[in-house]
Amino acid sequence: INWLKLGKKILGAI
């Protein structure tokens, strides 16, 4: 799991 990509997606959703 790419946490950087996942985190960026979450931040973008907020």
Curated annotation (Swiss-Prot):
GO function terms (MF aspect): toxin activity
One Gene Ontology CC term in the entry: other organism cell membrane
Single GO biological process annotation from the record: killing of cells of another organism
Keyword Membrane: yes
Annotated keywords: Amidation, Cytolysis, G-protein coupled receptor impairing toxin, Mast cell degranulation, Membrane, Secreted, Target cell membrane, Target membrane, Toxin
Tissues expressed in: Expressed by the venom gland.
Positions where Isoleucine amide occurs in the chain: I14
Domain of life: Eukaryota
Location relative to the cell: Secreted; Target cell membrane
Family statement: Belongs to the MCD family. Mastoparan subfamily.
Function: Mast cell degranulating peptide with high potency of histamine release (EC(50)=0.09 uM on rat mast cells). Also shows high hemolytic activity (24% sheep erythrocytes lysis at 50 mM). Its mast cell degranulation activity may be related to the activation of G-protein coupled receptors in mast cells as well as interaction with other proteins located in cell endosomal membranes in the mast cells.
Protein name per Swiss-Prot or TrEMBL: Polistes mastoparan-R1
Natural source organism: Polistes rothneyi
